[in-house]
Each structure stands twice: as structure tokens, then as C-alpha cells.
Amino acid sequence: MRHYEIVFIVHPDQSEQVPAMIERYKSTITSHGGQIHRIEDWGRRQLAYMIEKLAKAHYVCMNIECDQTTLDELEHAFKFNDAVLRHLIVKMKKAETGPSPMMKEVQREEAKKSAATQPSEAQA
């Protein structure tokens, strides 16, 4: 089995359905004997360019190990899901398990937000 990194972008109006979508894709992978090494929900982010007149979308990254039939099934699911705006599947040499640079950025932004709200709460 080969290692893959999958990033898919979901319509921002469908953000509440992302956990269910991730579970569906996880069950597809594991039911065919594949493994999931990392799943990262990057949240709503600014798009580099407008897609379907949208400036923001919900990003999800998955690092998996699966066979070609499972990958074909996942790609088919992405293509025929109207909520998925774009998807990218990249073959990797080895399994990635640590946090991605994008996830580190998300965590840094969350830390800044929580640090900014704590002083205002202390004054109140």
C-alpha cells in the first residue's frame, strides 16, 4: 500500500458537515484495510483566489495509507460531493504523522486569540 496526503476544501456553508464527511472518508479507508496516519481540520481559511464566488472555505488534510481501489473510491466521493469545492491527492514517500506547517500556523493563531481574550477577561 502507498502513502498519500489528501487536502480537500469544503464550501463554507457546509462547515458543520465536515466532521461527518471526515468520518465517512475514514470508514471508507479503514473498511478496505487502509490506515489513517493524520487528520487535520484547518478550519475556515482565506482562498488564494475566488472559487464559485467564495473568498473563504473549510480546509481538511488527511495522511493515509491505502490501495488504489480505495483511492479511486475516495476520489469518486470527492468528485460527486457538491460540498467539496476542490481536492488534491499527492503520493508521499513515507507516512507523515507530525503536525503539518499549516496546522502549526492554525495553533499559533488560536494561541494569539486566546491570549488576546484573557487580558480583557481579567480586567472585567
From Swiss-Prot:
SUPFAM superfamilies: Ribosomal protein S6. GO terms for molecular function: small ribosomal subunit rRNA binding; structural constituent of ribosome. Residues 96-124 are annotated as: Disordered. It holds the Pfam family Ribosomal_S6. The keyword RNA-binding applies. GO terms for cellular component: cytosolic small ribosomal subunit. GO terms for biological process: translation. Keywords: Ribonucleoprotein, Ribosomal protein, RNA-binding, rRNA-binding. Binds together with bS18 to 16S ribosomal RNA. This is Small ribosomal subunit protein bS6. The lineage of its organism: Bacteria, Pseudomonadati, Pseudomonadota, Betaproteobacteria, Burkholderiales. The gene is rpsF.
